[in-house]
Amino acid sequence: MLFRSKLEYVFINEDFEKKQDHKVLLEELENKNIKIYKTSNKIFSEMVDTENTQGILSVLRYKERDLVNNINQDNKFVLILDRIQDPGNMGTIIRTADSAGVDAIILLKGCVDIYNPKVIRSTMGSIFDMNIIQTTQDEAVDFLKANNFDIVSSYLHTESYYNETTYDGKIALVIGNEANGINDELISKSDKL
């Protein structure tokens, strides 16, 4: 699998190092010249924010992405997230988008930080594989419309349901805030509701 992030180094605790089935992973990391820092269980527990850890912590370099360089002519399905605030919801959306074959996720202002530990955990690794772009609403809408995407907003008050709509061509599906839905300006710029 090609990850969009570069693994810089890992920390492991004493318990992780002792387990025989972890030796293969540690050898692979060493073969790839990834630095491994060994810590006591006590120090490791102070580095993480969960009580029951697996004993390994990775540090990755994540490259910021822009629309122009990360959405291309081959992309057909993009997800736009408008002010998603719950970390668990964000992680689940990213994980689901990855498994559904979404080409990119666009995060608009007001979304929870995707580097929040709860977001990262709930993605179950998908965050490192997905093309995630943070940008403004105006920039996203202008770029997508210029590149022939239909902006389709999930909207409570509509005359057609998702299974009654055709999804030909390039689609940018908008999912709104848990409490307030999609903002009115984005609704007005949508091609379909």
Give the predicted meaning of each segment:
Residues 1-49:
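N-terminal positively charged helical leader segments and presequences
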Residues 3-9, 13-17, 28, 70-158:
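RNA substrate-binding interface of SAM-dependent RNA methyltransferases
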Residues 21-25, 113-119, 180-189:
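Short, glycine/polar-rich helix-capping loops at beta-to-alpha or helix-loop-helix junctions
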Residues 27-30, 54-56, 122-126, 168-172:
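Short, hinge-like loop/turn segments at secondary-structure boundaries
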Residues 39, 61-65, 134-135, 154-160, ...:
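Short gly/ser/thr-rich secondary-structure transition/capping motifs
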Residues 43-85:
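Hydrophobic alpha-helical segments and helix pairs
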Residues 153-193:
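Active-site/ligand-binding-proximal alpha/beta "capping" segment
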